[in-house]
Design a protein with these regions (language model features):
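N-terminal hydrophobic targeting/anchoring segments and the immediately downstream early-domain regions
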Residues: 1-16, 20-23, 27
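General structural signal for secondary-structure boundaries
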Residues: 14-18, 106, 126
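N-terminal active-site wall of soluble small-molecule enzyme domains
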Residues: 36-116
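A very general structural signal that marks isolated residues within well-ordered alpha-helical segments
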Residues: 43, 119, 131-132
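Hydrophobic or amphipathic alpha-helical targeting/insertion segments
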Residues: 116-122
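Conserved small/polar residues in nucleotide/adenosyl-binding loops
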Residues: 124-133
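Hydrophobic alpha-helical segments, chiefly the membrane-spanning helices
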Residues: 136-141
Length: 141
């Protein structure tokens, strides 16, 4: 058996006893199974159309090793901040597989995306609270 499982009352992650991982890394600890991640990605990938792009939401977990693994298996990335964008680029992500989206982007974040030729930028803007209420303020304000 592989991935993450319990056998005879003991937790195993990719056939490594959980107690041994706890001894080596201490607790609490985050332990991930690359096999589970790869298998789950394959389940999605096998169902998509050829032109579809699966984009991992980096805000869910920006661990560099996980991002590198996802790069290796062909994943795209959904990023919402400049730091998430930097991590994906550091992991070796294909700039054509990065979607930079969301609200409240700084000029620095947008410039960084442009300088790195991130072509898929979905930027949503809305007036600031001050601008939205300005029309309701007395003219002397």
């Amino acid at each position: 058996m592989t991935g993450i499982h319990v056998k005879e009352g003991n937790l195993f992650v990719e056939n490594i006893l959980g107690a041994e991982l706890a001894k080596k890394y201490g607790t609490p600890a985050f332990i991930y199974s690359s096999e589970v991640i790869r298998n789950n990605y394959a389940l999605y990938s096998n169902q998509k159309r050829e032109d579809d792009l699966i984009c991992y939401a980096v805000k869910a977990n920006s661990n560099l090793n996980i991002l590198k693994m996802l790069v290796d298996i062909g994943s795209g990335f959904d990023v919402v901040s400049g730091n998430e964008l930097k991590k994906c680029l550091l992991a070796g992500a294909d700039k054509n597989k990065i979607v930079f989206s969301g609200v409240a982007k700084s000029e620095e974040e947008i410039t960084h995306a442009i300088e790195n030729e991130i072509l898929s930028c979905l930027l949503y803007t809305s007036p600031s609270p001050r601008d939205r209420t300005r029309s309701r303020m007395p003219s002397s304000a």
